[in-house]
Swiss-Prot record:
GO molecular function, one term: NAD+ binding
Subunit structure: Homodimer.
One Pfam family named in its UniProt record: Ldh_2
NCBIfam families: PRK13260.1
Subcellular location(s) of the protein: Cytoplasm
The name this protein goes by in its record: 2,3-diketo-L-gulonate reductase
InterPro entries for the chain: Diketo_gul_Rdtase (IPR023689), Mal/L-sulf/L-lact_DH-like_ah (IPR043144), Mal/L-sulf/L-lact_DH-like_NADP (IPR043143), Mal/L-sulfo/L-lacto_DH-like_sf (IPR036111), Malate/L-lactate_DH-like (IPR003767)
Binding site for NAD(+): 168-174, 224-225, 304-306
The family this protein is said to belong to: Belongs to the LDH2/MDH2 oxidoreductase family. DlgD subfamily.
Amino acid sequence: MKVTFEELKGAFYRVLRSRNIAEDTADECAEMFARTTESGVYSHGVNRFPRFIQQLDNGDIIPDAKPQRVTSLGAIEQWDAKRAIGNLTAKKMMDRAIELASDHGIGLVALRNANHWMRGGSYGWQAAEKGYIGICWTNSIAVMPPWGAKECRIGTNPLIVAIPSTPITMVDMSMSMFSYGMLEVNRLAGRELPVDGGFDDNGQLTKEPGVIEKNRRILPMGYWKGSGLSIVLDMIATLLSNGSSVAEVTQENSDEYGVSQIFIAIEVDKLIDGATRDAKLQRIMDFITTAERADDNVAIRLPGHEFTKLLDDNRRHGITIDDSVWAKIQAL
């Protein structure tokens, strides 16, 4: 089925207000969920909303909490999220990193006691739209086996890097081959994964999303490389925020909350003039996209460039929502 942006935001707002969320908070949160979905990231927008409400109802999320700055060291700040709403807090933290970068050239905000930020790419994009390089990542509950293990002991720990090119170039990737949200998207669509995404119950690589969702043996991105990167991202976020590691979140909490996150903004224009910046970025993009194609029918893509088209299509033709997901939201 298809819905308009206003219908989608209205559905989110209704559910949030039914939980006695303050009007301005409910409006901003509903806006962010709707914008994420409109951008084509269904896995962390509309599909994730029922899970968000579950955590809200369980008390994992404290909707009226106010994040508090704990430490200030010039270009670096440490904040405590107080388990406030994840996407609203993350937006505020990247805004703060941008403010610090405008003063120092670079700004870094380390956040503890945070909740799931939904679409991490929103915050990298937020920085790039203002002309900054945006880098951010989060740890999580243990949902992935380290390389060589069967048990989940590391997080998917998504990493975002956004560049202020035209259009914006952005990598938004979990440390697994696919996020659990994308496993759900493919399962709901009745599709196999395009490449192996995890192991089946016999320890063989599989493209079946439902099998991986059930046994939790998701495949690290780049095998041992993604496993290693997940571990060091967790260590950095934990140390800089003085917050919880994947081990602590997993062993001490009843669900995924109280995570640690990093937000970095870099003001490129303090280091290079605008014309030179644009020319260098365009040369990089042209050099890549003019390579001889392996398949004439498949274009060479740059990361993140598809979001501009997805957003335009959804604004023109309406936002496609899975019927079962829409039914869940209507029942909340």
